[in-house]
């Protein structure tokens, strides 16, 4: 019988809801760090010139601190196992124009979820 080996390494997640940045722009940044170690992801984000880098850096630091505090995992052993960006609600505003008209402005938001696991497996 073929049985799948289950992954028993502990994992931790952190999420950020309703970030006022387009999910297209945020997804471009998150795709660069998926699968990286904690330290490498922070280094990559530090040198990228995008506005989404700062909240993603804070979210990764929060997930690593959660893993350290709640599960006792060391930050140097963590890697990003899951990183996803979903489309949030669109905030609608109106821009006044000439002769009583109004143009609609759509301000997109996104939801970011970061999952981290330890490289060391628990048997």
Curated annotation (Swiss-Prot):
Q: Per the UniProt entry, what is one GO biological process?
A: translation
**Its function?**
This protein binds specifically to 23S rRNA. The globular domain of the protein is located near the polypeptide exit tunnel on the outside of the subunit, while an extended beta-hairpin is found that lines the wall of the exit tunnel in the center of the 70S ribosome.
Q: Assembly and interactions? A: Part of the 50S ribosomal subunit.
| CDD domains linked | Ribosomal_L22
Q: Member of which family?
A: Belongs to the universal ribosomal protein uL22 family.
Give the organism the record lists.
Answer: Chara vulgaris (Common stonewort)
List localization entries: Plastid, Chloroplast
Keyword terms, alphabetized: Chloroplast, Plastid, Ribonucleoprotein, Ribosomal protein, RNA-binding, rRNA-binding
What name is this protein filed under?
A: Large ribosomal subunit protein uL22c
User: What main location does UniProt list?
Assistant: plastid
Matches recorded under NCBIfam families: rplV_bact
Naming one, the record's GO cellular component terms include: chloroplast
Matches recorded under InterPro entries: Ribosomal_uL22 (IPR001063), Ribosomal_uL22_bac/chlpt-type (IPR005727), Ribosomal_uL22_bac/org-type (IPR047867), Ribosomal_uL22_CS (IPR018260), Ribosomal_uL22_sf (IPR036394)
**Keyword rRNA-binding belongs to the record:** yes
**Which gene specifies this protein's sequence?**
rpl22
Matches recorded under Pfam families: Ribosomal_L22
Molecular function GO labels: rRNA binding; structural constituent of ribosome
Give disulfide pairs as residue numbers: none
- Which PANTHER family does this entry report, sorted A to Z? CHLOROPLAST 50S RIBOSOMAL PROTEIN L22-RELATED (PTHR13501), LARGE RIBOSOMAL SUBUNIT PROTEIN UL22M (PTHR13501:SF10)
């Amino acid at each position: 019988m073929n049985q799948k080996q289950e992954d028993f390494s502990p994992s931790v997640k952190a999420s950020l809801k309703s970030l006022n940045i387009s999910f297209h722009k945020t997804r471009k940044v998150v795709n660069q760090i998926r699968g990286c170690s904690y330290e490498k992801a922070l280094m990559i984000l530090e040198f990228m010139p995008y506005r989404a880098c700062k909240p993603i850096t804070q979210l990764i630091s929060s997930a690593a601190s959660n893993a350290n505090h709640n599960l006792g995992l060391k930050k140097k052993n963590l890697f990003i196992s899951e990183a996803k960006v979903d489309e949030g609600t669109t905030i609608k505003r109106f821009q006044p124009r000439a002769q009583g008209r109004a143009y609609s402005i759509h301000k997109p938001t996104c939801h970011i979820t970061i999952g981290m696991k330890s490289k060391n497996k628990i048997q």
